[in-house]
Amino acid sequence: MQKRSVFFISDGTGITAESVGHLLAHFPTVSFKHIRLPFTDSEQKVQEALLKIAETEKADGARPIVVMTLVNTDLRDMLKQSNAVHLDVFGSFVDPLAEELQEQPSRTSGIAHSVLGNSYYERIDAINFTLNHDDGMTDFGLSEAQVILVGVSRCGKTPTSLYLAMQFGIKAANYPLIPEDLERGSLPEALKKYPEKLYGLSINPERLHSVRSERRPDSHYASLDNCRREIRLAEDLMHREGISWIDSTSRSIEELSTIILQKIRVNSNH
């Protein structure tokens, strides 16, 4: 497998640069090493970045990829002196817009987040909420959740919840359907008050067996028979409770989140 190093260089937090970096997922046969250099906002820091890029090129034997979000044109020009593949987010998008609109863009670092006003801080609040309500950790404040993902252990609830919080500012809780719930054939008591917030995830039993075996090999928990049984009982339970659900086996977190987000928006309009 081809291996390449990718630098995410920003004069702010680097969130925008890393968002662009999600496009790397379209090259599944390449292994990318991520190197983050946030707050690169001076000539000295750019010089340090240039040194790291040169060292990485020498070690890898291949040009690094540099995703940059620098608003200062002088610093951008300095960075482009490196022997790398440069993806200049500001130059590629903002500069052509400035020419078309006949307006000078703001050169203030972090403006991409500050213009969002309260929504930026709402996203941070959503992340904290999601971390505090991961895997049924607590039902305190569960009424604030915009969605509660349910499903058997290791079906993708946690990464999907975090993606919803980080990318969309959604307060996403997740709650496991444990063997006791499945045997009883009913939802955990804490969830019964919020049927409209529930959304289920399921998974192919063979895939679940593989994932669980990495964590607890040769256990009843990871056995294929148990995985098949848990999935069957969980899907039966979600069907009885009228919970919409989706199979996560062959879907990316981005795709799962988009589908769930559509449900949240439909519910919020009712």
From Swiss-Prot:
It comes from the Bacteria. Pfam families: Kinase-PPPase (PF03618). GO terms for molecular function: ADP binding; ATP binding; phosphotransferase activity, phosphate group as acceptor; protein serine/threonine kinase activity. InterPro entries: Kinase-pyrophosphorylase (IPR005177), PSRP (IPR026530). Its EC number is 2.7.11.33, 2.7.4.28. ADP binds at residues 151-158. Keywords: Kinase, Nucleotide-binding, Serine/threonine-protein kinase, Transferase. It catalyses: [pyruvate, water dikinase] + ADP = [pyruvate, water dikinase]-phosphate + AMP + H(+); [pyruvate, water dikinase]-phosphate + phosphate + H(+) = [pyruvate, water dikinase] + diphosphate. Belongs to the pyruvate, phosphate/water dikinase regulatory protein family. PSRP subfamily. Bifunctional serine/threonine kinase and phosphorylase involved in the regulation of the phosphoenolpyruvate synthase (PEPS) by catalyzing its phosphorylation/dephosphorylation. This is Putative phosphoenolpyruvate synthase regulatory protein. It comes from Methylobacillus flagellatus (strain ATCC 51484 / DSM 6875 / VKM B-1610 / KT).
